[in-house]
């Protein structure tokens, strides 16, 4: 078409022109063009075709590409109504243009491959393939090249554009690409160009047209990827010179664009990015020019206008290009073009509207520069061959060329030959029309944004080889300018080449990176060759990445201002911001890839420049302003693979980034996320690490990214994707390494605190703690309502026993069904139904008292299982006579005769065979029955099989009848075999098991085989998973519970109840004797746990009681796991306070009884003890006492330390059996840890091992530990060290005793008692004393072989001490000794000081030494003459004397009795005297500690008499209590033997010579005096005088009650052995009562007054005894009594020896250990109440009167609680001697037995006395006065 026609073409034509050329960004009439200009970098001309143009239409990268394409389109396309017309016009005007242009372009493409590979080469290749290249193209190119700066453009031939039109990538493709790139409506640039046509004289000249066409080709080849659109547009519009024309027509190398400085190139790059729009606007002008060439409408001012345009340009870029032809062509062109574009801007301002069409020239300059960079390597020769003029220009490398910018260099052809052919075609077309030498193919190639070169990713590519050089090296693949046509183009190459398509923006960038990295880059790329075919399309875009490094930098600088590109936004979407910065599109890509400022592109791995990281993104939206993007790509791109990021960004599978989306994040983001394994959304799109991902081929180098705008077009994206994938392969690590690192960044470290599994926890009550997964730490507490099940659980009348009422069980079963039906009305599962049926059957069984043979039960059970059957039976009429003939076979006469013959002969077997063979089953059955059950069963089975053969039908007759007949016949085994062998039978019975069960069970009464069948059938059902059916079968048979049948009713929760009910029903049978404990133990335990879970702790405790009681009596082996769970449940329930009503909580009731007994004996009433049911009532006092038993004041005592050190030495097993301690025996340091205990536990004797024959009393300064499990073991964290359990008699210990105590050891208290338990075992066991003296507990030693194996009960209670045949473990004794308040013991000590000391000394003398004089002991005893031996608190053997000593230490020491200690005294067999405390020693803070004393007595025993206020009566017999106050003398060993014989071995056998497992009952010998205190102390209760009534539960500790006593599991009472021992020990005999003075109520108080006065000491003594007695009790164990250091009432321990001695002189019972004066003081009784005076005064109280006046320790009244805190009365040890018994009716108190004592109170007075006036009228409670 004519140029005029083109000038006047309608808007459609202009739009089409815009589509291809992207010219006139100013012409907003064409939305596509305008956007193309804005978004498209001039250097990134849409060599890929319209799509590429569209991609360039994006604000930044798109603008570059589009600008270059549009400008080139301006050069090539005339202003016609359509592109086809423009092409035809150009082809007609310049027939040889295409050919010449193609020839030149082939060379240019070589240079273009690196500079404008994605640009012009793709287009030229497409033109070559699609357009007939006119022969005059070469000629025209030469002419255009020779035309230096002539403004006259060579006329473009329409044939060229015809060829363009013939390309598949026409306007439609362009629009498709634009559609993808969000091209906003643009003003039709053609219209504006038409308006400005007259100002373009070159349009009229063919030369001008050719010039512009060639220039357009060059520009397309060199489309700078950097944002030089602006400069190029202005330059093109203002200063199109003949040089430019020549350059345009010639190859890039030959294009003589004026070279410019790098600064100008950078500026040009910036302008290119900015002027992409201008370039686009110029491109239309170029089209106009070409069009004018086609329709010669010469503009006379064309040349002048060109001069004006280049007037500001001092450098003749065309000449410079000619000088530096090659370099300038590739890089120099860009650089030169950039200045030209920069300089023309001023002129452009005046002519911008008219000369916007020249923008493409500017872009073309960049492209030419890019081409020059490329031709430097390959295309130079080609270009020279194509165009002589162009070659020299191309040869001259532009000074601005940069090898580091390979992006700009993109070969226009994949192959040089194709490029030459294409040049020829172009030249031919240019001859016809030189206005637009960039066909749509070229536009496709513009996909790659040139500005990407600046991208730090592109910069590395430049280093590897400038994109120009790279593209030049790979021109063949990238030669075609239409990048979109060749998605295969290498990512690095194609992307680098793409920027050249955007030559305007990329040219400057290409210049810096041109030659160095051109060839090397593409040569290194393994991709170029495979992409060669594709590269023509991508070649243009590929070069932008390297070349555009600078433009990218400039654009990158612009990009930061723009919002980050959305990686998922459409690339075509164009925003005003994007439009405002067209060149920034390229910077998008380049910015991330290249650092700010021109950075030489880093050579990609393999020498190939990687495509721009975010090419597509850049094309999509201006990434330069997105700082995050920049940061993303900055590091990775600069380092190595900038292009990879671009590729990653342009992945065809990744949505195009919107104008606001970060460019290049599209692909790399997803890739990074995939690498990290996190969700794509979690990946930070701005993370620099993500940018390196070039995975998406769609993304190209920064320059390519500009062209990647066109990459939005499917071809471009595909090519870029391919390139990116290849690039990705080349350097995966660099791409993904950073991405992974940065993707890890967004991970929230607190995610684990927010996203967790729900937390669910059952509380002790109805509370459930649950934290749902999505709750934000908000805890909502809701009441757990179990619904119907909770009601069922609460209402269950368990635990069931024989005493339970059957009606309650039946009622519960009915209520259960009601609750379940109401709670789950819609739930009618088979299992629920079966469960209900089981419940009904059990109810019937309970109603029948467990008789499974009861017809009522069987009928009920069968009706429950098969109700319909029984309803039918009832409806059936009674069978009447039948008229039907029998169908049975019958023997004929002959057969009958034969049968008769057999029967007569006795051959019944043959007769049976005859009947069976004849089918006469009646006779056969009868005969077989006579032969026995086996024959009968076989015959019946044969009959059933014959009559009812196996069938597959579901008929009951054929299946059920044979079963019944076989059962009747007793052939049960064959039935089960049939079930197992015949599948149909098994299937039927499993489905109809109810029918089978009911049919058989209904006949259970008549046939004994029914149970056998039901059992077998039940097992068969269970083997097939029908457990409820099995349970029904077993219930019907009355099978006992067994391990295989331990749960009734299946595994549901109802099974807990059903099992217990079934057990209960069976127990109702009189014959039910089987112990079902073990089978149901786990069920009951689970039931108890379930109750505890639901907060029903009381009910749970009842189950625990039952289980514990059963375990006590069972002889079966209980699994340890069950025991462990049971113990845990006990502790759990006891902690909730539900054990008040527990099986051991009943102790309170027992205590009440004991209290009544105390009241009866002592005549005192106990007020209710406060706090006995308080919060801490359940805690054993030992817990608190242990912590407070340390006597700080005794720490520095040497004697104390000596004792502690001696005690710290453990006794070896050798010592235990009389051997001296071995030299290797472990020595326990004061720290309580034995060196050998830890290393060799066998060296230590077990705690419960029987003591050695030579075992010596051990001193436990502290209180004894609790017994059983509650007692801290040495290995327990609560276990005190064993330092105090050493043998004082041991010489080594004596040596140790002199050693200073360890800083870790806690010194034993002075008043500590010696324990007589097994020293060796005690070394292993812990005691409170040891606990006090040692902070570090000793590990429990290994059990020795001599120890007894624990019984089941002991295992259950974890207490081996429960196993003892009168050999009580010390811990048990210690438990009881804990109950005795220290104050009381102190008071006792005071009262019996003398006697105890004497007795102790005697005992020590009696005890033989181990061969080593116990000088230590002697010294201690000599020091402590006034202090008796302390109680053996730890071992439970209480030395009253020692306790008294400790007590006396609290009080002012009375004058020491005459005590002589022989130097041979040895504590080896007796307790060594304890070191007495100094009187000044402050009382212990712990009232419970031994010897601790407070003004108030601590808690008193609720059931025991209150502590005596005013007496320290020697209620506790001395060791030598029988002796008077005379001086102690050596007692003969017999005393010791007797003593030991009376000692309760169950509490301590350490004092016994032989480890006797039991000791004979203690016979209190009056001749010998009160049994030595060590005897009674040996009792488990520590204080002999405090020993409670045998079996009194008060003596038991909570540990014993909780964890079991000796009697069995968690026994709350003393074991039988303990009780028996106590009874034996305290067996009452006549002589035992010598000290017992019952209270006799005198009817005549007046008469009793003098007696009471005279016998007051005896009363005080009895009071003290009663006080001492009252100290023992359950509450004393729990710390409920007041232990204030004052003597407490002592319960009467009948049969227990007393240490009081009746003094004839004083006429009173005195304590030899206490000075008489003191006793006399205290002996004065309070005045009796005023009663009628006695007529007959008595000077000496009679024996009968003594009880009323003298209260012996055993019978002394118990002080009321109020008086317990009063001052302590003085002991009455020095009371008057008892008078000689006078003849009277009353029995002598000394010889009175218990009955006599009890009768004294009710016995009438002496003869002649008045009858008793009141029940207690004569009783005087002295303690209350």
From Swiss-Prot:
Biased composition (Pro residues): 1469-1485
Compositional bias ranges of the Basic and acidic residues kind: 114-128, 193-209, 262-271, 422-436, 1524-1542, 1681-1696
Annotated spans, Disordered: 1-67, 106-356, 371-590, 620-675, 687-726, 1165-1188, 1206-1308, 1322-1353, 1387-1696, 1712-1825
Keyword flag Phosphoprotein: no
Alphabetical UniProt keywords: Autophagy, Endoplasmic reticulum, ER-Golgi transport, Membrane, Protein transport, Transport
Keyword Protein transport applies: yes
GO biological-process terms attached to the record: autophagy; Golgi organization; intracellular transport; protein localization to endoplasmic reticulum exit site; protein transport; vesicle-mediated transport
Bilayer topology annotation: Peripheral membrane protein
InterPro entries assigned to the protein according to its UniProt record, in alphabetical order: Sec16_CCD, Sec16_Sec23-bd
Record field: compositional bias (Low complexity): 391-412, 458-485, 576-585, 710-724, 1227-1239, 1255-1265, 1324-1333, 1459-1468, 1611-1620, 1789-1808
Compositionally biased spans, kind Acidic residues: 304-318, 371-382
Subcellular location: Endoplasmic reticulum membrane
GO cellular component: endoplasmic reticulum exit site; endoplasmic reticulum membrane; ER to Golgi transport vesicle membrane
Biased segments, Polar residues type: 39-60, 214-226, 272-282, 294-303, 327-338, 500-513, 626-650, 693-709, 1179-1188, 1279-1289, 1344-1353, 1406-1445, 1543-1576, 1651-1674
Protein role: Involved in the initiation of assembly of the COPII coat required for the formation of transport vesicles from the endoplasmic reticulum (ER) and the selection of cargo molecules. Also involved in autophagy.
Family: Belongs to the SEC16 family.
Name of the protein this chain belongs to: COPII coat assembly protein SEC16
Gene from which this protein is expressed: SEC16
């Amino acid at each position: 078409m004519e140029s005029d026609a083109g000038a006047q073409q309608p808007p459609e034509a202009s739009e089409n022109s815009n589509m291809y050329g992207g010219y006139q960004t100013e012409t907003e009439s064409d939305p596509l063009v305008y956007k193309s200009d804005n978004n498209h970098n001039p250097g990134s001309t849409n060599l890929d075709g319209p799509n590429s143009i569209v991609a360039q239409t994006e604000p930044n990268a798109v603008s570059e590409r589009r600008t270059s394409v549009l400008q080139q389109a301006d050069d090539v396309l005339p202003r016609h109504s359509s592109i086809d017309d423009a092409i035809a016009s150009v082809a007609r005007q310049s027939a040889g243009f295409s050919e010449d242009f193609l020839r030149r372009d082939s060379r240019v493409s070589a240079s273009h491959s690196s500079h404008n590979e994605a640009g012009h080469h793709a287009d030229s290749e497409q033109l070559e393939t699609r357009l007939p290249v006119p022969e005059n193209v070469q000629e025209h190119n030469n002419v255009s090249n020779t035309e230096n700066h002539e403004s006259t453009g060579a006329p473009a031939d329409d044939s060229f554009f015809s060829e363009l039109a013939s390309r598949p990538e026409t306007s439609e493709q362009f629009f498709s690409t634009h559609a993808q790139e969000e091209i906003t409506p643009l003003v039709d640039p053609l219209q504006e160009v038409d308006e400005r046509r007259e100002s373009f004289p070159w349009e009229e000249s063919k030369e001008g047209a050719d010039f512009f066409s060639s220039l357009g080709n060059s520009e397309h080849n060199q489309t700078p990827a950097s944002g030089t659109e602006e400069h190029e547009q202005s330059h093109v519009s203002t200063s199109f010179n003949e040089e430019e024309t020549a350059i345009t027509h010639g190859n890039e190398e030959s294009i003589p664009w004026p070279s410019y400085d790098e600064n100008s190139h950078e500026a040009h790059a910036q302008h290119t990015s900015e002027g992409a729009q201008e370039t686009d606007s110029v491109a239309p002008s170029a089209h106009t020019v070409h069009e004018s060439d086609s329709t010669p409408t010469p503009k006379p001012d064309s040349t002048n206008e060109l001069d004006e345009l280049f007037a500001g340009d001092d450098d003749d870029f065309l000449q410079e290009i000619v000088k530096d032809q090659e370099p300038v062509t590739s890089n120099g062109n860009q650089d030169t073009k950039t200045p030209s574009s920069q300089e023309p801007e001023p002129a452009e301002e005046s002519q911008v509207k008219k000369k916007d069409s020249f923008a493409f020239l500017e872009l073309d300059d960049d492209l030419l520069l890019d081409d020059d960079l490329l031709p430097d390597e390959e295309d130079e020769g080609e270009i020279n061959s194509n165009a002589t003029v162009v070659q020299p220009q191309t040869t001259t490398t532009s000074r601005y060329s940069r090898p580091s910018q390979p992006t700009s260099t993109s070969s226009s052809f994949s192959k040089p030959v194709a490029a030459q052919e294409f040049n020829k075609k172009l030249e031919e077309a240019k001859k016809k029309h030189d206005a637009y030498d960039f066909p749509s193919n070229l536009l496709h190639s513009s996909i790659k944004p040139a500005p990407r070169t600046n991208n730090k990713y592109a910069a590395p590519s430049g280093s590897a080889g400038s994109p120009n050089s790279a593209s030049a090296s790979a021109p063949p693949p990238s030669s075609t300018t239409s990048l979109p046509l060749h998605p295969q183009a290498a990512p690095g190459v194609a992307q680098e080449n793409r920027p050249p398509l955007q030559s305007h923006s990329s040219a400057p960038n290409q210049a810096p990176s041109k030659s160095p990295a051109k060839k090397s880059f593409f040569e290194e790329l393994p991709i170029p060759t495979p992409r060669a075919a594709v590269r023509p399309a991508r070649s243009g875009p590929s070069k932008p990445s390297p070349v555009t490094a600078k433009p990218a930098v400039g654009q990158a600088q612009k990009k930061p201002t723009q919002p980050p590109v959305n990686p998922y936004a459409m690339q075509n979407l164009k925003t005003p911001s994007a439009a405002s910065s067209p060149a920034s599109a390229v910077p998008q890509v380049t910015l991330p890839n290249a650092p700010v400022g021109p950075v030489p592109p880093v050579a990609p791995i393999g020498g190939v420049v990687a495509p721009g990281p975010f090419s597509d993104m850049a094309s999509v939206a201006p990434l330069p302003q997105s700082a995050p993007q920049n940061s993303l790509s900055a590091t990775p791109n600069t380092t190595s693979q900038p292009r990879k990021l671009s590729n990653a960004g342009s992945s065809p599978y990744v949505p195009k980034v919107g104008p606001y989306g970060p460019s290049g994040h599209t692909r790399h983001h997803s890739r990074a996320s995939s690498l990290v394994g996190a969700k794509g959304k979690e990946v930070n799109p701005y993370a620099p690490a993500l940018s390196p991902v070039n995975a998406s081929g769609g993304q190209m180098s920064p320059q390519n990214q500009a062209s990647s705008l066109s990459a939005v077009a499917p071809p471009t994206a595909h090519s870029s994707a391919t390139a990116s994938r290849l690039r990705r392969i080349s350097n995966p690590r660099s791409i993904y390494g950073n991405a992974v690192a940065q993707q890890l960044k967004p991970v929230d470290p607190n995610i684990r605190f927010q996203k967790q599994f729900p937390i669910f926890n059952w509380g002790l009550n109805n509370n459930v703690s649950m934290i749902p997964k999505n709750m934000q730490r908000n805890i909502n507490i809701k009441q757990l309502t179990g619904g119907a099940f909770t009601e069922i659980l609460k209402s269950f009348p368990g635990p069931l026993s024989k005493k339970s009422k059957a009606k309650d069980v039946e009622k519960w079963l009915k209520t259960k069904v009601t609750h379940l039906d109401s709670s789950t009305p819609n739930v009618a599962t088979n299992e629920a139904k079966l469960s209900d049926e089981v419940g009904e059957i059990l109810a019937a069984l309970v109603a029948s008292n467990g008789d499974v043979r009861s017809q009522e039960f069987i009928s009920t059970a069968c009706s429950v299982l098969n109700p319909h059957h029984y309803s039918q039976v009832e409806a059936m009429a009674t069978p009447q006579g039948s008229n039907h003939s029998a169908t049975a076979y019958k023997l004929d006469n002959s057969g009958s005769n034969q049968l008769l013959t057999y029967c007569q002969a006795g051959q019944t077997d043959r007769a049976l065979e005859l009947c069976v063979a004849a089918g006469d089953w009646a006779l056969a059955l009868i005969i077989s029955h006579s032969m026995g059950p086996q024959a009968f069963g076989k015959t019946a089975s044969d009959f059933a099989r014959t009559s009812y053969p196996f069938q597959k039908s579901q008929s009951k007759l054929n299946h059920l009848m044979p079963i019944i007949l076989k059962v009747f016949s007793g052939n049960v085994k064959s039935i089960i075999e049939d079930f197992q062998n015949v599948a149909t039978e098994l299937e039927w019975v499993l489905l109809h098991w109810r029918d089978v069960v009911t049919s058989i069970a209904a006949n259970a009464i008549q046939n004994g085989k029914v149970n056998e069948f039901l059992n077998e059938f039940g097992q068969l059902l269970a083997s097939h998973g029908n457990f409820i059916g099995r349970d029904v079968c077993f219930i019907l048979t009355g099978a006992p519970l067994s391990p295989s049948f331990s749960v009734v009713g299946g595994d549901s929760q109802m099974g807990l109840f059903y099992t217990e009910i079934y057990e209960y029903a069976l127990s109702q049978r009189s014959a039910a004797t089987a112990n079902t404990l073990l089978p149901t133990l786990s069920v009951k335990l689970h039931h108890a746990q379930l109750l505890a879970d639901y907060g029903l702790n009381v009910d749970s405790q009842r189950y625990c009681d039952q289980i514990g009681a059963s375990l006590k009596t069972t002889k079966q082996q209980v699994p340890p796991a069950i025991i462990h769970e049971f113990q845990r449940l006990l502790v759990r329930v006891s902690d909730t306070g539900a054990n008040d009503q527990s099986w051991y909580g009943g102790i309170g009731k027992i205590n009440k009884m004991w209290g009544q007994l105390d009241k009866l004996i002592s005549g005192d009433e106990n007020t209710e003890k406060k706090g006995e049911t308080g919060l801490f009532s359940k805690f054993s006092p030992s817990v608190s006492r242990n912590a407070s038993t340390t006597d700080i004041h005794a720490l520095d005592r040497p004697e104390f330390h000596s004792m502690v050190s001696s005690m710290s030495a453990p006794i070896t097993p050798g010592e235990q059996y009389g051997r001296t301690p071995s030299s290797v025996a472990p020595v326990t340091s004061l720290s309580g840890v034995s060196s050998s205990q830890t290393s060799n536990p066998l060296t230590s004797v077990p705690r419960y091992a029987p003591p050695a024959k030579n075992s010596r009393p051990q001193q436990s300064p502290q209180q004894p530990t609790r017994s059983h499990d509650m007692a801290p073991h040495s290995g327990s964290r609560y276990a005190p060290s064993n330092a105090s359990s050493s043998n004082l008699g041991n010489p080594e210990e004596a040596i140790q005793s002199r050693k200073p105590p360890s800083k870790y050891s806690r010194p034993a208290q002075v008043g500590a008692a010696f324990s007589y338990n097994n020293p060796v075992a005690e070394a292993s066991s812990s005691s409170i004393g040891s606990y006090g003296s040692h902070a570090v507990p000793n590990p429990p030693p290994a059990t020795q072989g001599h120890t007894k194996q624990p019984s089941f009960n002991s295992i259950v209670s974890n207490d081996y001490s429960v196993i003892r045949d009168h050999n009580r473990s010390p811990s048990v004794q210690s438990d009881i000794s804990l109950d005795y308040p220290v104050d009381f013991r102190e008071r006792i000590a005071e009262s019996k000081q003398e006697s105890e000391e004497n007795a102790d000394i005697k005992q020590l003398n009696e005890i033989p030494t181990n061969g080593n004089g116990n000088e230590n002991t002697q010294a201690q005893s000599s020091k402590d003459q006034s202090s008796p031996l302390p109680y053996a608190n730890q071992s439970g053997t209480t030395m009253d004397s020692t306790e008294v000593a400790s007590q006396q230490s609290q009080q002012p020491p009375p004058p020491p009795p005459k005590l002589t200690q022989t130097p041979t005294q040895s504590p080896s067999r007796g307790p060594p005297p304890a070191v007495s405390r100094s009187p000044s020693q402050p009382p212990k803070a712990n009232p419970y500690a031994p010897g601790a004393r407070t003004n108030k007595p601590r808690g008193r025993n609720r059931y025991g008499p209150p502590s005596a206020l005013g007496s320290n009566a020697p209620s506790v017999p001395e060791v030598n209590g029988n002796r008077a106050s005379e001086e102690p003398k050596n007692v003969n060993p017999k005393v010791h033997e007797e003593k030991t014989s009376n000692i309760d071995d169950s509490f301590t056998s350490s004092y016994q010579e032989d480890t006797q497992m039991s000791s004979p009952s203690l016979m209190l010998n009056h001749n010998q005096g009160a049994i030595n205190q060590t005897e009674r102390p040996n009792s488990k209760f520590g204080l002999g005088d405090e020993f409670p009534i045998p079996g009194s539960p008060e003596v038991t500790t909570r540990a014993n009650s909780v964890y079991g006593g000796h009697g069995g599991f968690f026994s709350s009472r003393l074991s039988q052995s303990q009780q028996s021992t106590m009874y034996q020990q305290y067996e009452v005999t006549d002589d035992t009562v010598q000290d017992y003075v019952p209270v006799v109520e005198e009817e005549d108080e007046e008469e009793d007054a003098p007696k009471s006065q005279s016998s007051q000491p005896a009363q005080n003594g009895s009071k003290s005894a009663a006080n001492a007695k009252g100290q023992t009790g359950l509450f004393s164990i729990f710390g409920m009594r007041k232990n204030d250091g004052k003597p407490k009432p002592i319960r009467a321990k009948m049969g227990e020896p007393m240490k009081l001695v009746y003094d004839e002189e004083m006429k009173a019972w005195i304590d030899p250990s206490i000075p008489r004066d003191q006793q006399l003081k205290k002996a004065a009784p309070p005045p009796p109440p005023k009663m009628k005076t006695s007529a007959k005064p008595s000077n000496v109280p009679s024996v009968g009167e003594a009880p009323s006046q003298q209260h012996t320790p055993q019978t002394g009244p118990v002080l009321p609680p109020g008086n317990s805190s009063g001052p302590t009365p003085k002991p009455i040890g020095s009371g008057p001697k008892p008078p000689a018994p006078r003849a009277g009716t009353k029995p002598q108190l000394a010889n009175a037995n218990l009955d006599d004592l009890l009768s004294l109170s009710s016995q009438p007075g002496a003869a002649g006395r008045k009858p008793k006036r009141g029940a207690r009228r004569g009783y005087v409670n002295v303690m209350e006065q």
